Amino acid sequence: MKARELLSSAAAVATAAGVGVAAWTQIERRMPTLRRYVVELPEGLETRALHILQIADPHLYPGQDFLVDFIRGLADEEFDFVVATGDNFGAIAGADMVKRAFEPLMDRPGAFVFGSNDYYSPRKKRWSTYLTGPSKHSKKRNVPDLPWEDLASFFEAAGWVNLTNQAEIIDVPVKTSIFAGDADRTNFVRVGLIGVDDPHIKRDRIPELPDGWYAADTIRLGITHAPYQRVLNEYTSDEANLILAGHTHGGQLCVPGYGALVTNCDLPRELASGLATWSFAGKESPLHVSAGLGTSPYAPVRFACRPEASIIEMRPAARA
């Protein structure tokens, strides 16, 4: 075969591969999955297990009904507490979709923080800009155009805790069976919650810790939309038993065997999604960063990074 023919064949193969990858990015973004993790609590914490459902980054807009159905279906899973880590809207037209998605979860206890796309609708930009560093929010956009107050009222009406630069301690009902054959009993787990508004647009203010934060019967959770290091460091200093975040989309376009290219914040790319350990000043906290469920309407693609929700079991340390 002549060199020209070889080059022509190679170009054809490369083109076909590119078309295949592009097609798959459209398929994969429509394949949400539920992931499960276990976090072992430190010895000395006198509590029962707590199962947390985390929902991150739905970015709902018309045409995303498959995500609405997926979120609604999560109500059939077994969990005790819901944490919504923000970026619920993909457009103003998605407001009713957000309520419809979360409605079956409203009879469970929960807490929430917001991301920038709960305040400001996304703007069209080149994907390549994400490769040069975290996206920038225009200082000229200082009046939210999304119905964040209405969404906050919707969550609060169900009893969910608004953790916008707030901290609180609550009792979460959990069902446990003490002995095989027993009927389920309702018990309570005391949970300390600390949250901030979106660090990505510099709305974060670390609140004062509530009384009882360090009590021996209290599970401590740190919640943020974007996992910026300054917030993770504060939560780790406060000895959070688990930090929950979203925002990164897991990198959204990943390289198999390498992982995420970017995190859209100052978090190392190796921590773009999943369960890890964050260390600061001699202390450590488990960190779960969700790859999230949605995408911007202007970049509706995923590769090697399926959309996801997560259930994290916080399990008491095994007794010797």
Named regions from a protein language model:
Residues 1-13:
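Membrane-penetrating hydrophobic segments
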Residues 15-101, 121:
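N-terminal active-site segment of His-dependent metallophosphoesterases
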Residues 26, 49-68, 89-91, 120-140, ...:
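Acidic/histidine-rich helix-loop elements
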Residues 49-59, 188-199, 221-225, 286-292:
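Active-site-proximal beta-strand elements of phosphoester/diester hydrolases
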Residues 54-56, 81-87, 110-116, 163-165, ...:
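Active-site neighborhood of phospho(di)ester-bond hydrolases with catalytic His/Asp-centered motifs
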Residues 66-171:
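Core catalytic region of metal-dependent phosphoesterases/phosphodiesterases
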Residues 125-160, 164-166, 171-232, 299-302:
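Binuclear metal-dependent hydrolase catalytic cores centered on His/Asp/Glu-rich metal-binding motifs
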Residues 227-310, 318-319:
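Conserved beta-sheet core of the metallophosphoesterase superfamily
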